[in-house]
């Protein structure tokens, strides 16, 4: 079963993403603070790159250092569809997909399938 780690400060969003991805058959671990350790080996990390308490790009680099081979999907309310600069900056940090909030379950699942494939 593919493992996904979600890094998101907002509890409601963490819970919603966990529910959506678990229903698709993924094993999900959600954390609020971005402290993703070596024991959190994952097939994918979904990270909110804008959090008020931490600089998103710095946190992304820290998580990547702990999980160097793991692909990332970045989510944020700061991205705007069609805003090339945000996508370019995120991809320069090694992010495979960028999703602007608010997004639908369908959009999230499509991005996850694109990066790691379906759970079954």
PLM regions: where:
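Alpha4 helix (beta4-alpha4-beta5 surface) of REC/receiver domains from two-component response regulators
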Residues: 58, 79-97
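Acidic, metal-coordinating helix/loop segments flanking the phosphotransfer/catalytic sites
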Residues: 27-44
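Hydrophobic/aromatic residues positioned on beta-strands within the core alpha/beta folds
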Residues: 73-78
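The feature encodes the CheY-like receiver
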Residues: 52-53
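Conserved acidic carboxylate
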Residues: 8-9
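Active-site residues of response regulator receiver
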Residues: 48-49
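Charged docking surfaces used in two-component/phosphorelay signaling
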Residues: 15-23
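C-terminal output helix
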Residues: 100-112
